[in-house]
A protein has these predicted regions:
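Rossmann-like AdoMet
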Residues: 1-128
Length: 129
């Protein structure tokens, strides 16, 4: 099934970041984000501009590596923490981290609407617009 997504402005940037994580997972493998790959495989969207922006790709991957390490370290020392992921976009960290009691993804209403299509709430993961 292919999901047609039409966004512009700030909300559109979330598609570029999830694409960078999926592409990295499929190619060089500095990170592994299989949920991002699942999302990209479902979308009907032209990612040609994201393919041309190597600096953006590198920045997304560097930020992902740093944030994954910080969140993992924090959760290891604070079992059962509640996580508030502000400006979450299509971040998929909640699906690979362990040790939290509840994860809240917060963003603009149009972003959360896309999240609800592609990454619906489940169990201890909630979305707030």
């Amino acid at each position: 099934m292919s999901e047609k997504i039409t966004l512009s402005g700030v909300p559109e940037t979330m598609l570029q970041t999830v694409y960078a994580r999926a592409k990295e997972t499929k190619t060089r493998g500095a990170i592994t984000d299989n949920k991002a790959v699942e999302i990209i495989d479902r979308l009907d969207y032209d990612f040609s501009m994201a393919d041309k922006d190597a600096a953006m790709h590198s920045g997304v991957i560097a930020r992902t590596i740093v944030l994954d390490k910080l969140v993992k370290t924090y959760l290891a020392g604070h079992g059962g923490a509640v996580v508030e992921n502000i400006a979450c976009g299509l971040d998929t960290r909640c699906y690979c981290m362990k040790g939290y009691s509840h994860w809240y993804n917060l963003d603009l209403p149009e972003t959360i609407a896309v999240r609800e299509k592609l990454l619906p709430e489940s169990g201890n993961i909630s979305q707030i617009a």
